[in-house]
A protein has these predicted regions:
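Short, low-complexity disordered leader/linker segments with a strong preference
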Residues: 1-48, 121-126, 336
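Hinge/beta->alpha junction and helix N-cap segments in small-molecule ligand-binding domains
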Residues: 52-66, 80-90, 112, 144-153, ...
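Short, hydrophobic alpha-helical segments
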Residues: 99, 158-166, 227, 298, ...
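Hydrophobic alpha-helical
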Residues: 108-124, 128, 192, 209-276
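Loop/turn elements at helix/coil->beta-strand transitions in domains of secreted/extracellular proteins
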Residues: 47, 75-78, 101-105, 124-128, ...
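N-terminal glycine-rich anion-binding loop in soluble enzyme alpha/beta folds
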Residues: 32-81
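Flexible loop/hinge segments that line or gate small-molecule binding clefts
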Residues: 113-149, 168-169, 173-176, 270-279, ...
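Hinge/cleft segment of the Venus flytrap/periplasmic-binding protein
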Residues: 30-48, 176-177, 184, 290-336
Length: 336
């Protein structure tokens, strides 16, 4: 039986559709997060490791890449990076390159979950750590989000905000999803709803509006029409599978003069949106994934796997809800 982990990010790219599509997958009980551990200098000397990147054009993906490169260098390992750019065919080509380059282990941030079997087959038969998206059947460990808990963290923050400010009254709950990333979408977006419901009760079906539009470009496309269906409404909740979806939502709302009508929650809290979170009091929460520290989990555990050491399958990040009031507590002084 397959073990199911979790996911991250703009690309990353409903519930019923995903349940049907991934009927053979099972969702494990939530495991506690692991602590970050910096690579031990010299621990990777003589080793060659690989990284199939999400997309370096995306802030989250670039932060992950940079952190893994930093820790690999510290460990003394040679890192071969290949950017998947959100495309299955490019990720497949990366795996083939790793085989030719004789990498001894690699991390895979391929964005297309159903392409994982082909990628696993094409690549070298070495230890693999999946990042944020399932990479069955070859993943030896899953590193990334505890998706259900990540969604619930900011979903609850939204519920608490609406309870305090509006007595839990709202006009719509717009969910910008990414069906292409598999069960991670169901867990993360369902987590938003369960977290919100824990404070304000279940979301009525007529208020829930779901779109396959978690990415920046997709959110820019669908939000104007979505807002058109809600004329005169000023308490609209918008959640997205990543930060970029919410950037797109606010940009689209601003174009039609309605940026103050939406209240948002996102996933990632990546560096590229820190100023947005700090300065926009309608960006109620963003679940922190700390992509700039992913390398502090991926690199030391991948080296352990290559050396034959036992590693927990679940290597999940400990999530925190970030907002304008606490962002500098966790990320330091932010100059915007």
């Amino acid at each position: 039986m397959k073990r199911t982990g979790s996911k991250s990010v703009r690309a990353l790219a409903a519930v019923a559709a995903i349940v049907s599509l991934f009927a053979l997958q099972t969702v494990p009980a939530n495991a506690g997060g692991v602590d970050f551990r910096k690579a031990v200098p010299g621990s990777g000397k003589g080793l060659t490791i690989g990284l199939i990147g999400l997309d370096d054009a995306i802030g989250f993906g670039k932060d992950v890449h940079d952190s893994i490169a930093r820790e690999a260098k510290k460990a003394g390992a040679t890192l071969i990076f290949c950017d998947g750019k959100l495309k299955a065919d490019l990720a497949l080509a990366c795996a083939k390159t790793f085989k030719l380059k004789k990498v001894q282990g690699y991390a895979n941030f391929n964005a297309v979950a159903d392409a994982a079997p082909a990628i696993c087959k094409a690549g070298p038969q070495v230890p693999v750590i999946a990042i944020d998206i399932e990479q069955d059947p070859c993943q030896a460990a899953f590193m990334g989000a505890d998706n259900a808990n990540a969604g619930a963290t900011t979903g609850k923050a939204l519920g608490e905000y609406f309870k305090k400010n509006f007595n839990c009254e709202y006009d719509a709950f717009i969910s910008l999803e990414d069906y292409g990333v598999g069960i991670a979408n169901e867990l993360r977006m369902g987590g938003y709803r369960s977290g919100f419901a824990s404070v304000c009760g279940a979301i009525p079906a007529d208020k829930l509006k779901k779109y396959d539009a978690g990415r920046l470009d997709k959110a820019l496309e669908v939000m104007p029409a979505a807002l058109t269906t809600l004329p005169g409404k000023s308490k609209i909740i918008v959640v997205a599978i990543n930060d970029q979806g919410i950037q797109g939502a606010f940009s689209a709302a601003k174009q039609v003069g309605r940026e103050k009508d939406i209240y948002a929650g996102s996933q990632g809290a990546e560096k590229s949106v820190w100023c947005d979170i700090k300065n926009n009091d309608h960006w109620i929460g963003a679940t922190a994934y700390f992509p700039e520290r992913y390398g502090e989990i991926v690199v030391p555990y991948l080296i352990d796997l290559i050396k034959g050491k036992k590693v927990p399958f679940q290597l999940k990040v400990k999530h925190i809800a970030i907002n304008g009031g606490n962002i500098e507590k966790y990320f330091g002084k932010i100059s915007c």
